[in-house]
Amino acid sequence: MTLTVNRLHFAYQQTPILRDISFSVPKGKLVGIVGPNGCGKSTLLKLLSGQMKAQRGEIQLKGKPLASYPMKGLARELAYLPQRPTLPAGILVEQLVQYGRHPHQGWFNQWGEEDARMVRSACERMQLESIWQQSAASLSGGQAQRAWLAMILAQDSDMVLLDEPTSALDIGHQTEVMEAIHRITAEGKTVLLVIHDLAMAARYCDELIAIGEGTIAAMGPAREVVTKDLIDRLYQTSVDILHAPGDGAPIIVPRRHEHGRTLRSAS
């Protein structure tokens, strides 16, 4: 396993946010973390990235305690992209991607041919060749996310953590970004991402971890986790689940509400 979490507990000002969280992330898989707003998804990702520290429990990366890694050493093994990262003013796409090589720099290891090769390769794999000399601020939502993902690729970490990479994107750009993330796992990287769209999660993720009220409500193969019962329970709403022709991916259809009550089918 690339990442193992054992009985993790985190509280904020005496209020429990995450309780007794345990799971493992297999190497080379795309694993999604889903759940309603405020359930602790983003907090969990910050704990796994080393941005925050849990009060109890253990996180292991490649068999070693996460806390044992020095900052740059951890960045060479694990890349973390927060939700809505801030672009530095006036930066070009190529310069943004170059930031991914920072963990590999040092007093005796300055910018070299390998760094330039990794940046070019990352831009090509994220299909940025035609825009890499543009201002990053001028990019569309989908292009901007692909630029951030290229930076992650240039970092060349085996484990990638992404916090809601498709938030605030329309369905076209969501698909564009999820296809790009899928390509990353196809290259052998392990990706753990927080994602709100359950249908997208079930279509693209290998496995899902569903969190409700700070605990794991379900986990396993993505299309087995996304069930009517789970959605009713976690999101306090009623849905119907259809299946897409061809691959059978779930299509989630919320039931209409009238005067605060869910309209139930006659059956």
Each language-model region and where it sits:
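Conserved ABC ATPase signature
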Residues: Q110, S135-L139
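Conserved structural motif at the start of ABC-family nucleotide-binding domains
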Residues: L3-V5, L18
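The feature captures the beta-strand-to-loop junction immediately N-terminal to the Walker
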Residues: V34-P36
